[in-house]
Amino acid sequence: MSQTESTKGVKITNYAAIKNAPLPADGPGAKNFSNWLLLGLLTGVPLFVTRKFHGGLKTFIFFFILFAIPILMAYWTVLSSYSPRLNEKVQFPNRGVEHYLKFHDDQLAARYQGQNKIPMETFHELYFEGKVSFKGDALDALEYRHDWASFRFTLSLFRFFLLGMIPEVIMHSRSQDEEQVRDHYDRGDDFYSWFLGDRMVYTSGLISDVNKDESLEELQDNKLKTVCEKIQLKEGEYLLDLGCGWGTLAAFASSQYGAKVTGITLGKNQTKYGNDKIASFGVDEKQSRILCHDYRDTPLPKDENGNTTKYDKITCLEMAEHVGVRKFRSFLQQVYDMLDDDGVFFLQYAGLRKSWQYEDLIWGLFMNKYIFPGADASTPLDFVVSALEATGFETVSIDNIGVHYSATLYRWYKNWLSNRDNVVNKYGIKWFKIWEYFLASSTIISRQGSATCYQIVLRKNLNSYDRAGYISTQEGLQGPISRKTDWVK
């Protein structure tokens, strides 16, 4: 089969670099969702009841508050249950639920069979509890999820959104951030090494050749070099890496480019691991170091004379999502204030598509509940760019690397499966299943555009900035220019 083969108008790919989709189907979503109708119901129902009771403004406000949540829940439930698919180019095999899943409860088996599909949120909760299993590989079954699962909103989904996620969005205190990050990242370095591999990088790598099956280490090395080249990192420059993880970028930039790097993380295990990694490359701690700090306490660097200065370059790879929507602008302002006026800010940001499908939202709530609690700032691109520009940054370039993330996640998934016994023996079967589902579903989600990742290069929007000096880093322009042919005879 060729790299892409058309089946009823839909391309079925066969690239070596990624996990190719056998059933790239679209579901229902934003195209059939009317905010105006929802607003009409939210105001119309309490207004109707108010008039029946011959009440005034206070009565209307009372009924508005009383009915708001039930109306929202009913509206989302009905639309997620009965809205038509975005398109029906891809036909489902209609094999029945029992072809893909094995229930370990007779009542559940009787309830979900044939074309009576199980809600995806219900499924993954039952899967983690051991009440249902995949018949075969998890990722293979999830590729055909439209054939056995629905994306209807459930009561437990609403409960988590209202009582779990919303309070976290509102609060996002220092203590909350510290508790969530340390609970997640200090679980144990071995836990993460069992899927991240030797590089210990928990962010997307980059594909260099879509027709080549590169290793996870090659993908991550491609990314490390790309980051340093995009910011034109030079020897002796002060680099700040916010959310540095296990310090791999800090070690790379220090040893390969001679930069003076400060890495910031809330993870205690990550701090020790990162400093040990930097030292293993023969880099003195006076040159580069990892600090266990809240990002709000990031220190400015000091020059050779002991004077406080600013950072020449700042990188932030998939950490900004943890800041929270409410704190996002203040976070960017802090970055702006710490960056030299001639400096460069590199932001790698995991975002969501604006034209969402219900599947996307259910996956996002799963991620917030089980994988990245408090990471509510994953948003569509326009929110990020608007916030950056309002802070005073100017965009140099934006690259969408969502499919690169899918390739990275697929390799993490295979690593995780190969370490099943290690995980189960130390952390239990439930943790194995949660991460198995996370890595498998995310491989699909990032490949199909539900969630994606952007590399954004930024500078301060000042009149004095040397914009011409960064033309050579704009590969999206330089690549096509270098391949052009003369057309004038």
Curated annotation (Swiss-Prot):
Main location as per UniProt: membrane
Assigned GO CC terms: membrane
Disulfide bonds, paired cysteine numbers: none
InterPro entries: SAM-dependent_MTases_sf, Sphingo_C9-MT
Pathway recorded for this protein: Lipid metabolism; sphingolipid metabolism
Residue numbers binding S-adenosyl-L-methionine: 202-203, 239-247, 265-270, 295-296
Gene Ontology terms: biological process: methylation; sphingolipid metabolic process
Keyword list, A-Z: Lipid biosynthesis, Lipid metabolism, Membrane, Methyltransferase, S-adenosyl-L-methionine, Sphingolipid metabolism, Transferase, Transmembrane, Transmembrane helix
E.C. numbers: 2.1.1.317
Superkingdom: Eukaryota
Localization terms from the record: Membrane
Annotated knockout phenotype: Produces only non-methylated glucosylceramides. Shows no alteration of growth and no increase in the level of resistance to plant defensins MsDef1 and RsAFP2.
Class of the enzyme per the UniProt entry, highest EC level: transferase
Protein name, entry field: Sphingolipid C9-methyltransferase
